Structure formats: C-alpha cells, structure tokens
Amino acid sequence: MSSLAPAAPPAGTPLWRRKIALPPGLARADAAALGALALIVIVLCWPVLAQGRVYWERDLHLYLYPHAEALVRVVAQGSLPLWNPYVAFGEPLLANPQMQLLYPPTWLQLLMTPWTWYAGVVVAHLFFTAVGAYVLARRWQTSRPGAFLAAAVWVTSGPLLSFVNLYHHFCGAAWIPWVVATSDRALARRRARDVLACGVALALQIVTGSADMCALAGVLAAAGALRHVEWGRARWWHNRHLVLTGALALLLGLGLSAAQWIPTTAMASRSSRFDQPERIRTYWSVHPATLVQAVVPVPLGALPLSDEARSALFESREPFLLSLYLGLAAGVLVLAAIVETRAARAVALVLAVVVLLALGRHTPAFAVVTTLIPPLRILRYPVKVMVAAALLWAMLAGMGADALGRTDRRRRRLTVLALAVVAIGLAASLGIASATRPDELGAAFLQRRALDPPFSVALVPVARRVLLAVGFATAVGAAALLALAPGRRWTATVASLFAIVDLLVANEGLNRTCPPELMAWRPPAVDIARAPDGGRTYAYDYYVATRGRASLSHAAYALATPPADPSVGAVALRGALYPSVLAQWGVESSYDLDQQGLFPKELAVLSRGLRIVEGTPVHLKLLRMGAVARVAAMHTAGFDDLAPVATLPTLFQEPLRIYAVPDPVPRVHVVGGVVVAEGDAALAALQDASFDPARAVLLPAGAAVATPPRAPGRCQIVSWKPDRIVVEADMDSPGYLVFADTYDPGWRTRVDGRPARLWRADFALRAVEVPAGRHVVESTYRPLSVGLGLAVSAVSAILGAAAWLRRGV
C-alpha cells in the first residue's frame, strides 16, 4: 500500500530548496500574506524584539506589573488565587476582570518577569489579531491582497496600538476580528463546529477582562449578521435558524466564561460601577475637532495645548488614546470602496454609527444607546469605540484595494479622485500652515510660557508628518488614476504599500519602551515604608485634589529637572511609592482610591472620606482603625500627629517622607463595645470623639453594647495566608474579633468549626462575634459566585466537547 505521506527529499538537498508542507486549507498566497503580516509586527515591535526593551507606560507600570507580582506572591504562598491582600485592605482577585486570571497567557507570569511576559503578549496578540483581520476580510469576500491590506491597516492603526498600554483592553481588542469572523462563519454555515468555534472565541474575549471590547465585538457581529438575513415574509424560517445559531454561540460563550463574569458581576453589584454618573461614563469622549486626527497625523495630545484647548479636547488630561490615526493614504482606498461597491457602503454606514458613539457627550447617540440597553451603563470612556472604527476602516481599505482592479468604472473613479484631492488638499494646507506660519497657528490653541521655545519647535515636526502623509496619499491617488488603464493591476499593490508605510511611519514609536532594569528597580523607600507586625501602609496619591496636594508649592508630581527620557517619570513615581505600585513588593496598602469603580461602595466612601478629614483628629482615627502603621507622603501639612521616620530623596521637587502612625490597632484585635449605625449615621459615628476603634466596633445592625474599660480578651494569629486566616481567641467575656481587612460576603468564618456570621464592621471592614472562652476562629475566602461560575463553565465545556466529538470534528 502506498503511503499518503509526502516523499522525503533526497539526501543532501539544501534546506532552502526543499518544499515546505503547508497546513491543510492554507494556500501559498495565504502563507505569504501571513508572513508579510509577521514582518509588519516585527517592525512595530522592533525595540522589544531586537533590543530587549519593555513597555512601561501608564497602566503597565502602575497596575499590570504590580498586580502580576501580587498574583505570583499569592500562588507562592500556597493560596488559591481568589483574594488579593495587597490592594486597599484587600480585594477579590479572580473576580477582578483586570487580573485576567482565566485568560490562558496570564499564567505564563509565573515563569518570567511581568514586563518580559507582557512584551511577548503584545507581539503575539498583534500577529494574532492581524491574522484575525485577514480571516474576517476574506469572510467579507475581499481578495487575498485586499485582505492582507485590511489586516495591515488594522494592526498599524492608531487606536489599536494605543491600547498597548491599556493591557486588558488591548487583549480584548485583539479578539474583535476573531469574534466577528467566527460569528459570520457560524451564521453562514450553521454547523456545530462553527458554532463551537464562535462560542470559544467569545469566551476567550470575555476572560480578557474588557467588557467594552466585548460590547464592541457584539455590535460588529450583530451588524455583520444582517448580511445573512433574507428579507421578506417568506424567509422567516431561514431567519429563525440565524437567531437560533447566534443564540447558541452566545450561550456557549457565556457558559464557558461564566467562571469569570459571574464573580465579576457579583463584585460589581456591590460597587458603584452600575451607578456611574453621566459625567464619568462620558469622560474622554472624542471631541468633534479631534476627529481630524483620524485622517491627519497631528498628535494633539503631545502638543503644548493651552489650558482651554486641553480642557475642551481632552478633559484637561492626556488623551486616553495616544493616536486616532487611521491613515490618510488608506482613506483614498476607503473612498474608492464606498463609491464603487454597495457592500462597502453598508460597512461605511456602520462605521458612521460607531464614530457617532465615540463622540460620547458631544451628541445624544451614546446616551440614547446606554438608556435603551441598561447593561451598557457599566461602560465608560466613549473614545474606546474608535478601535471598532479602526477595524471597519481597515476592512474598507481592503475593499478599496480590490476596487482599484476594476477598469470599467471610470466615472466613479474620477469621483473618488476628486474627493481625495479635496481631502489631501486640506491636509496639505494644514501642513504648510504649520511649517510657514507656526506663530499665528500656535497662538490659536497652544500655550507658551516665558521660558518655552517658540511655537515652531512644536509645529514644524507636525508639519513634516502631515506633509509626508500627504505625499503617501498623493501616491495612492496617482495609483488609482493609473489603474484605469487595462493591464495595470500592479497599481493596487503599490497603493497598498504606500497606505501601510503611511501608518507605520505615523505611528512609529507610539508605545515607548525602556530597559527592563527600570521596571525591576526596587526603591530604597520600600523597606522603610513597609509596616511592622502585619500593619498596612498608606501612600499618598497626588493626582486627586486634596489638601495635601494644595499644600505643595508646585504641580503634583513635578520633576526636579527636565527628564532626559520619558521613562524617568515612571521611575520617579515608583521611587515615590505611588499607591498602586506597592503591591509589586508585597507591601499591603490601605485607603486606595477606587480607580476602576469596583470597590465595595462602603470602602470607596471610606477612602474618599479619609481625604476629606485631613488635618483633623478623625484622620488619625481612621488611620489607626485601618491598622495603618506607616504613611508615605511628600508633604508635611496635616501630619503633625504622626511621627517622622525618614526623609528620602526623590526625582520630584519634594522628598519622600515616611511617618509612623501612633497606636494603630493590630490587623486582628478583640473589642467589647458595639455601636450600631448604618449609612450616614455610621459615618457620623466614626467621627464621634467617643468612638475608639481599639475598644469598640461599629456594626450596621444588632444591639449596642457599652464599651468596657478594657478588652474582653486576647487573640493571636496562628496562620495567615491571602485566602485563609486562623486566629486563636481567649475571651474573658463575649466580644468581637475585628479584622482590619475589606468586608466581602465571600469570606466564610467558623468558630471552633461551626459557621459564624461575618459582620461588616467599622463601615467597610469585617468582624465576627466570639463567645467567652478559648476558641479557634478560621476565616476562608470561598465566594459562592466563584463556585457557581466554575460549575457553569465546567458543564458548558462538557456539553461543548460532547457536541464536538458527536459531530466527528
């Protein structure tokens, strides 16, 4: 019997002359396109791949890397990865979607440093999402060259690359083309394996932790589903199958990912995330004036904008997305697609709706959609929607490249060229004005202080970038004109190359890197600020308006000298012990601000309240109540009742001062008095001078008990792990064991092996009642939501596997 395996090459055949066996179903043209996409990713990530540098900006060094180190510490202590003790009196670990605990790549953090790990994640996800865009374009009937261009425009687009420093959004965005492509295939073929593939893709996107990206994928998938609808009453049976197929894929995706979203939903239900005010949800909306950045490479956020301009355009902050640039040269191809094909016009209509949503508070659209679909109220920052616009723009560019191959539509092509000339002319005018009249242009929206350089220093580089983009777009327009002649199909290839190079040049260096040693550096202040005897540390946050920030004679976090490299600012923040980075070195923090909107409401109120009472005796009381033994700050005002420990130099204009808090309560202590109050009355009780957290506990219900003259007993910690605490209590009379840790109903407490009620104590912490005598109190974190989620995911996986095997896939 002859073998089906390919014959081995003759001995001695050089490697480069041997035929490479491609995977089944993969044509050589596809392999060439994927190879070219890999080359583009290499160019984008060259500093990381060739120089060993790492990404560091924004959420990466402030949240991702500390959280990754916290996860490693929790696992190393033999605990289940359910509770993170290092953030704000402790918080759920698995339930926090930004931890991405169920996303498979996350567990590689156990094998390497988080910054090295994330560099690999970026490279892998950029290539992965480029392949997904290629597959999606092919699903949408684009040719292989057109699909390659679509994938290249997507992976080099400003919005997608801007998400690199917003890690969970980046991972979620990488899955958007795959979710849309697999849903399109499932709806078209209605086969079990295609439904399973769509469900798995959706589940993996959900566990990346970005609800925003999941919502965007759902919107695009729903829009794509419309092309499979057969309109008319006689086609209702076919459309019924479409609905059934989509529902099965959605249910499978939700079932497989239930271990993530059920605990996350339980966590969010106790927070203020569902009650965000309109001003928070629509913060960082795309200003209509900044939409010009989508087709003209003007980095407005990096310019020295006047206070008025920055307030209007970026909420007086840095832009949420560093680049909105989608490509001026690609725009010529987008115009060609819209003018020449009906399918492209349908995609363009969805693109227009998406951009309208990105405008957020500047139009009623975002408010209308979130009102009609209440679950979407959990989403915030409409500018994120621009990543969906980038994908649609890329698909249109691919369609436009295909349109250039048609030579029978001269009138339409001339219409495209006329529109392109207008757009290119406007961009060229902006570039020329920036180069020749920087003072007049800069005076309109830039600021210049006495020692600042002239406006030309900021605007001339912008002019160069804009005029270079104009040159690329002009070349694409010329290629479109030449394509009208028969036999010039090569013009589409030339146009595609110019469109890709335009985006590569414009977004080059968008995500800055630094040597890995900067992220590994351990500031000397860490060991001094670490609280003794299991106490907590309170690190001051100067990004929020407080009395402490107002006491500084300069802007918050102002560097002492101009930085030689942007990464110096990150090093300075870490050296000054910015609150969120404490977890990287295993320092347990306290009173952190609720940046994600996922803290329990009571804890968020308590943390804000600490800032409100600065400079009063209540401030010290709250520090003592939270077992805070050390305070790290760069100011002195309001800390007269604290004891100075050390003063350390920083890269900022102020040194870092470490203070000791007098007489903080132990992490676990016994009290006899009970004060009963809830809500505003509880906050008032905390501030009452008669309430001493070392002798009494504040409970939301029950019977009040007068504070005894001395503690009703003693306690000793026997075992302390992140998810399990064992305490021995020797009680002379009944009392309460108070834990200076966040209350969460997932903590299961037993006294001598018998279940005991866990109380929310001191407004946001927790306590358990203990009778007289010697007792062992065991508190273990095992939330019901995690068990339920794991059970649903397990059942879904079993059902999915059974369907897969039954179909003989």
Q: Model features per residue range: what roles?
A:
Residues 1-46, 242-250, 335, 481-497, ...:
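Start-transfer (signal-anchor) and selected internal transmembrane alpha helices
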Residues 38-131, 152-174, 280-326, 360-373, ...:
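Membrane-interface coil-to-helix junctions
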